[in-house]
Amino acid sequence: GRTGEYNKKNENFDGVIYMPCLESNGFLPELPVETPDLIYLCFPNNPSGAAITKDKLQEWVDYANKNGAVIIYDAAYEAYITEEDVPHSIYECEGARTCAIELRSFSKNAGFTGVRLGFTVVPKDLVREGVALHDLWARRHGTKFNGAPYIVQRAGEAVYSPEGKAQLKEQVAYYMRNAHTIYNGLKEAGYSV
């Protein structure tokens, strides 16, 4: 990236504010002391599976708006949310339209791995230094990307049909049962999971 040089001593890049997600903090990063211009959050998180409550996510939205930062919110695993206090989108938080970009993928919820279909939400209300980020994104995307193939678009459309929603629900339940089996097996083998 364009953040700075790689520091071999601490194995970090200069110009990046690292936000540790550790077992001791529930795999949820704390608000940084330094002021970032860009914040990346992924919830539910991969690989930890940690999910953020709406109240905690609201703290991040408020922090970003207060400090003029933009949140890149990766919601690829939102279909796996089972808790009621966990938002499925950052836009469930007040003020998120002025500070957040949300990424979605069909790979995780619909099994489209390798098909390469997803979408990005860049609200028109998101403006930095007098520039609407939506307009920049639309221009960049319009000149660099020719769109997903028609058959892939139709498959994505089917995901939102009543039949597609039912099939996705079954698929996610199947994956969750598999995860539960692995979890129980690791616990029985003496691992801390």
Language-model features: where?
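Histidine-centered beta-alpha loop that forms part of the nucleotide-sugar donor binding/catalytic region
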Residues: G1-T3, C21, A76-Y77, S107
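Short amphipathic alpha-helical segments and helix-helix/interface helices
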Residues: Y6-N7, L57-V61, I90-Y91, V172, ...
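Active-site phosphate-binding strand-loop segment of PLP-dependent enzymes
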Residues: E11-H88
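Conserved core segment of the aminotransferase class I/II
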Residues: C93, R97-M176, H180-G185, Y191
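Substrate-binding/gating loop at the entrance of the active-site cleft, primarily
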Residues: G1-F13
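Residue-level signal for pocket-adjacent positions within structured domains
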Residues: E11, P47, A75, D85, ...
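Short, well-ordered coil/turn elements that cap or connect secondary structure elements
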Residues: E11-F13, V33, K66, G95-T98, ...
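A Trp-anchored, charged/polar loop motif used as the substrate-binding/catalytic surface
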Residues: S24-G26, Y183-L186
